[in-house]
Amino acid sequence: MPWIQIKLNATNENAEQIGDMLMEETGALSVTFLDAQDTPVFEPLPGETRLWGDTDILALYDAETDTGVVLAQIKASNMFPADFAHKVEQIEDKDWEREWMDNFHPMKFGERLWICPSWRDIPEPDAVNVMLDPGLAFGTGTHPTTALCLEWLEGLDLTGKTVIDFGCGSGILAIAAIKLGAAKVVGIDIDPQALLASKDNAQRNGVAEQLEVFLPQDQPEGLLADVVVANILAGPLRDLSGIIKGLVKPNGVLAMSGVLDTQAEDVATYYRDELHIDPIIEQQEWCRISGRKQG
């Protein structure tokens, strides 16, 4: 059946309050926040809703809703000026799940690594295949930062190596490292849900025994690895540089992403004292910083 959508605009200071009002007082079935200015947004911290300064709000109602009544309720809330801008439109029903699934295809990284949704055929059965379904919270290979890290891992000889995935999220990098030959991988993340997702995805890929996951405060003392990958954000990469460098064995290698091109040189300066930094690699305004720790 068709739906009715009402589009409003708000600032980040009152967007969540407006969303609550639309759900509780006007009977909206769902409320979605969108960036009105296409500003990049990064993964929020646990429990945080990241909004933009100029936020579009989309409220969805069933087709029988009296939009005049809804607009009167919005006006009566005193959250908008009397002549507030809005747009009402009819949305045709679709098989949203099928449409969502159709958007995801197997992706190849480097010469031999594939990330494949479970509902798709594996293009190269003899290649290194990681089965991972797209989710809402954690990396699945579609973002340039994840792609940069996957390509870096694929280019290494990981046979028998130990690897740390710092900020493991879905576990995509950790699982790829195991499938590429790593003997043992440790995933670290501040979000317990990420640790659960990593273990679940490792189980589905048959590599759960080779993956250990920890919250930062629970990781073993003296933890070191031949290879460390950290796909997080520029701020934590700066703030935690001492910790991250301390995880890399002498002559070990480190790769970091989640860094915009305007941030890369600054982040790299935090690591040059202990690592020889490679040329910075850029993809769609995102960068990968890698290097080898001095022996």
Curated annotation (Swiss-Prot):
One of its GO terms (cellular component) is cytosol. The lineage of its organism: Bacteria, Pseudomonadati, Pseudomonadota, Gammaproteobacteria, Vibrionales. The keyword S-adenosyl-L-methionine applies. It catalyses: L-lysyl-[protein] + 3 S-adenosyl-L-methionine = N(6),N(6),N(6)-trimethyl-L-lysyl-[protein] + 3 S-adenosyl-L-homocysteine + 3 H(+). It comes from the Bacteria. Belongs to the methyltransferase superfamily. PrmA family. One of its GO terms (molecular function) is protein-lysine N-methyltransferase activity. This is Ribosomal protein L11 methyltransferase. PANTHER family: ELECTRON TRANSFER FLAVOPROTEIN BETA SUBUNIT LYSINE METHYLTRANSFERASE. Disulfide bonds: none annotated. It is an enzyme of class 2 (transferase). One of its GO terms (biological process) is methylation. Its EC number is 2.1.1.-. Keywords: Cytoplasm, Methyltransferase, S-adenosyl-L-methionine, Transferase. It holds the Pfam family PrmA. It comes from Vibrio atlanticus (strain LGP32) (Vibrio splendidus (strain Mel32)). InterPro entries: Ribosomal_L11_MeTrfase_PrmA, Ribosomal_PrmA_MeTrfase, SAM-dependent_MTases_sf.
